[in-house]
């Protein structure tokens, strides 16, 4: 992913998360950084999301296991309940889709094996933040 395109996608995702009531921050760092830092982290309630962000015109994106490891290492530094996510802006459909990662391995995120960001947020609010309400703006 081109750096400028990547930065733009990360900023867009942070903006969406903030509009849904998350505290969200983009971490501007290089993939070569030895520190276990996600592209974005977001919190709501006592839940911490570590997010690897991608943007593509293709129908799939591969995420190397070293990027997944960084998400889990980042989450392990905090006592909050953590979730590792891959968020992909599939530009052909003009939508964000996400995949929650539960184990360390190379991951392929496709249009078909991921869920729309708005659906993930809705499920997140229902399952983890029941008192937060369930109304979502259109993404």
UniProtKB/Swiss-Prot annotation:
CC cofactor: Mg(2+)
Feature type site, description Transition state stabilizer: 54
One of the Pfam families matching this protein, by short name: Hjc
Tell me what reaction this enzyme catalyses: Endonucleolytic cleavage at a junction such as a reciprocal single-stranded crossover between two homologous DNA duplexes (Holliday junction)
Q: InterPro entries from the xrefs?
A: Hjc, Hjc_arc, Restrct_endonuc-II-like, tRNA_endonuc-like_dom_sf
Does this UniProt record's set of keywords contain Flavoprotein? no
Report the record's Gene Ontology biological process terms: DNA recombination; DNA repair
Q: What UniProt keywords are attached to this protein's entry?
A: DNA damage, DNA recombination, DNA repair, DNA-binding, Endonuclease, Hydrolase, Magnesium, Metal-binding, Nuclease
Q: What is its EC number?
A: 3.1.21.10
Further remarks about this protein from its record = A second Holliday junction resolving enzyme, Hjc, probbly with different substrate specificity, exists in this organism.
**Its quaternary structure?**
Homodimer.
Q: Which NCBIfam families match?
A: Hol_resolv_Hjc (NF040854)
Return the similarity comment.
Answer: Belongs to the Holliday junction resolvase Hjc family. Hje subfamily.
Q: What is this protein called?
A: Crossover junction endodeoxyribonuclease Hje
Species classification: Archaea, Thermoproteota, Thermoprotei, Sulfolobales, Sulfolobaceae
**Gene behind the chain:** hje
């Amino acid at each position: 992913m081109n750096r400028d395109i990547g930065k733009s996608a990360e900023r867009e995702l942070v903006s969406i998360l903030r509009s849904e009531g998350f505290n969200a921050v983009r971490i501007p760092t290089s993939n070569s950084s030895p520190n276990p830092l996600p592209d974005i982290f977001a919190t709501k309630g006592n839940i911490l999301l570590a997010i690897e962000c991608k943007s593509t015109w293709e129908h799939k994106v591969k995420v190397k296991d070293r990027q997944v490891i960084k998400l889990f290492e980042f989450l392990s530094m905090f006592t909050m309940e953590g979730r590792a996510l891959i968020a992909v802006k599939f530009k052909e459909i003009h939508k964000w889709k996400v995949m929650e990662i539960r184990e360390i391995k190379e991951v392929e995120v496709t249009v078909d094996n991921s869920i729309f960001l708005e659906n993930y947020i809705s499920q997140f609010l229902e399952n983890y933040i029941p008192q937060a309400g369930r109304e979502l703006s259109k993404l």
